[in-house]
């Protein structure tokens, strides 16, 4: 599990690595290209057999990205509960993901399906579930956090209609562009070493906000008009702060965007938002307690994301 956590950190935060070749030379490589996503190479591996684990293991379907097994799919027959697939991946982690070169510890996302029902979840959901079953708390949070089958996610379309059927799920979630975007843009590896894979409505909201920014960038006449803005409705507990954080992070890296100013309407929300942003990524956000500090931050090229109350 420590190996999986370390490899997730490498992949999410520091994916440029030095590769020591057999001939003694060294080559700098990127585990994945997050800027030009279509330059990454995808392959599908069926029924890979691992003989070096505690027991011989055969994985159903693995999606390799640049040779690394980043997505693992476990399939069950129709009529079999998909929780059986969840438990099967649990056993893989215990018995064989660490075997050989430990490459399966790079898996970021797991997909489970019985054909009729299909769900996805991050590697730390699985990791924390294992610790829960062993009766001891996982690193960073209590056992009652995102650590069990209940925290797996349904995929959905742009109107939030659930896509449960495996064939339709594969056509959408596993479409090359969609999958690469989820891996490179819509995951957050928190300061507590939780890997959060955004839910479909969070991804849809983020993409629509970024699209409005692009519209304003290409047509300055729309700046300050309703066409350049919009509303996003999320219910209580749906992850609004994660949506806003990822939107701010992606927007701050866009051409033509110098600052992202996140305005909240109450002081307690200011503190709460900053705390949550800090949990998602240490040092990612700049807070302020006076107009002078705000002015300094607006003038500074280093303060990319600023949180401020409306008062």
Q: Where do the language-model regions lie?
A:
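Alpha-helix N-cap recognition
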Residues: 265-266, 290
């Amino acid at each position: 599990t420590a190996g999986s956590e370390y490899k997730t950190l490498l992949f999410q935060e520091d994916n440029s690595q030095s590769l020591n070749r057999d001939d003694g030379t060294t080559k700098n490589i990127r585990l994945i290209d997050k800027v030009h996503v279509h330059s990454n190479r995808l392959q599908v591996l069926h029924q890979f057999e691992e003989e070096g684990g505690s027991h011989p293991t055969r994985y159903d379907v693995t999606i390799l990205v640049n040779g690394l097994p980043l997505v693992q799919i476990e399939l069950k027959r129709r009529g079999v509960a998909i929780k059986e697939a969840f438990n099967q991946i649990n056993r893989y982690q215990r018995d064989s993901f660490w075997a050989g070169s430990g490459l399966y510890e790079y898996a970021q996302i797991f997909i489970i399906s019985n054909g009729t029902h299909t769900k996805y979840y991050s590697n730390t959901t699985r990791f924390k579930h294992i610790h829960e079953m062993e009766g001891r708390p996982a690193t960073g949070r209590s056992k009652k956090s995102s650590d069990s089958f209940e925290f797996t996610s349904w995929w959905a379309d742009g109107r939030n209609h659930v896509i449960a059927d495996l064939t339709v799920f594969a056509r959408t979630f596993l479409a090359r562009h969609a999958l690469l975007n989820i891996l490179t843009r819509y995951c957050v590896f928190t300061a507590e070493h939780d890997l959060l894979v955004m839910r479909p409505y969070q991804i849809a909201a983020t993409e629509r906000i970024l699209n409005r920014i692009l519209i304003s960038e290409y047509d300055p006449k729309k700046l300050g008009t309703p066409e350049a803005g919009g509303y996003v409705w999320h219910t209580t507990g749906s992850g609004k702060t994660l949506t806003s954080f990822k939107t701010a992070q992606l927007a701050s890296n866009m051409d033509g965007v110098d600052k992202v100013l996140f305005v909240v309407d109450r002081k307690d929300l200011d503190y709460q938002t900053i705390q949550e942003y800090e949990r998602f990524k240490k040092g990612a956000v700049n807070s302020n307690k006076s107009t002078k500090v705000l002015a300094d931050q607006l003038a500074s090229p280093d303060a990319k994301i600023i949180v401020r109350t409306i008062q």
